[in-house]
Structure formats: C-alpha cells, structure tokens
Amino acid sequence: QFRSLIVGACLATGLLITSVAQAHISLVKSIPTADAVVTTPQQIDLVFSEQLVLRASRLELSVIKDGGAAEKVEHIDVELINDGKTLRATLHNPLGVGVYQVQWRAVGDDNHPMTGEYSFTIK
C-alpha cells in the first residue's frame, strides 16, 4: 500500500510538471480594455503571461466602418517591451471617433500560436 502511495504521488507530480510545461501563452491584460470607451490612445498594449516570439506574434488594428466592414489602420509600429511580455502598437496618427477592433496572434517559447480579438470605442 505504501508503494502504491509513492507511485501515485510520483505520477501526480509528473502530470503537474507536464501541464505547467505545456501551458500556452495567454492574454493577461489589454490597454485599452475590451469594450472600453476612451479618448484617442497613443498606443495599444497587450500584456501576456510569458515572453513572446516577436517574429511570430502580431497586433493589427482596424476601424469598423458603417455597414460593418473593417478597414486596417496603417502607420503603427509594433514592438515587444516589458521583458518581451507586452506587445505594444504605437500609433503615429490620432484615431478618429469610432469602433476599433484589435486582432492579435501571440506565440511563446512552445511555438503554439494563440489568437484573439476585442473591440474598443473612441468618443
């Protein structure tokens, strides 16, 4: 019975280590936040749970036009900051009033891509 307990504890520890090692990257925080109503931001920050691989990660911003069509916002620079955990898009031109959609793709050291999107409004 003691041997079964030891074997069970070892298996549980191995499963825990495996699940931690295989945890995928996740979005922790966004600025502006989803569904926020804000004035024109100078940048958009997406904070992730671990370091990103820049060449495989991206952030795109679109304005939603009348009728629902999305038009990509040009003239933004995307970089990694905060020890590679934050994907920042710096906006070179002020954004006008409207609804904006952020689409992102994040890849961590495990090379597994995670994607997402959210919207915010500028009044």
Please state what every model-predicted region is.
Residues 1-9, 13:
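Bacterial N-terminal signal peptides that target proteins for export
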Residues 18-20:
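N-terminal signal peptide c-region/cleavage motif recognized by signal peptidases
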Residues 1, 22-24, 123:
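Absolute protein N-terminus
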Residues 36, 50-121:
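Acidic, low-complexity Ser/Thr/Gly/Pro-rich repeat segments typical of extracellular/periplasmic
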Residues 22-60:
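N-terminal non-catalytic regions of secreted/periplasmic and cell-surface proteins
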Residues 13-15, 24:
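Residues at the start of alpha-helices and the adjacent loop-to-helix junctions
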